[in-house]
Amino acid sequence: MKTFTAKPETVKRDWFVVDAAGQTLGRLATEIASRLRGKHKPEYTPHVDTGDYIVVINAEQVRVTGAKTTDKMYYSHSGFPGGIKSINFEKLIAKAPERVIETAVKGMLPKNPLGRDMYRKLKVYAGAAHPHTAQQPQELKI
């Protein structure tokens, strides 16, 4: 019996919507990253993108435990000397709530072209509204 490997053209991708309200950031991000990779499917193949599309709503209501609200820092660099910027979780969730979930999930995906393709299937929105109703996403309980 030959080992099964999924072909990129035969992979069936579903759409799921996840409500982040009241969810813990890390636990939510690990489940999303796993589903973006396709590890929940029996036809999972490491070198093929077998994952589903994930739409995350209510990103502004995600929570963290402990003192991470004030202590967790996010860093970015402009590329120029001395161009490092830092912002804590509390300020970032007020400024750009989508970036908190996007950053957490992106860090859990492979750092290669396949990982970038997986990351493109993640859609994050601050509020409850999203423009993907035409895809008829199924609700995913995490």
UniProtKB/Swiss-Prot annotation:
GO terms for molecular function: mRNA binding; structural constituent of ribosome. GO terms for biological process: negative regulation of translation; translation. CDD domains: Ribosomal_L13 (cd00392). Keywords: Ribonucleoprotein, Ribosomal protein. It holds the Pfam family Ribosomal_L13. The keyword Transmembrane does not apply. InterPro entries: Ribosomal_uL13, Ribosomal_uL13_bac-type, Ribosomal_uL13_CS, Ribosomal_uL13_sf. The keyword Ribosomal protein applies. PROSITE patterns: RIBOSOMAL_L13. It comes from the Bacteria. GO terms for cellular component: cytosolic large ribosomal subunit. PANTHER family: LARGE RIBOSOMAL SUBUNIT PROTEIN UL13M, RIBOSOMAL PROTEIN L13. Part of the 50S ribosomal subunit. This protein is one of the early assembly proteins of the 50S ribosomal subunit, although it is not seen to bind rRNA by itself. It is important during the early stages of 50S assembly. HAMAP family: Ribosomal_uL13. Belongs to the universal ribosomal protein uL13 family. This is Large ribosomal subunit protein uL13. It comes from Pseudomonas fluorescens (strain ATCC BAA-477 / NRRL B-23932 / Pf-5).
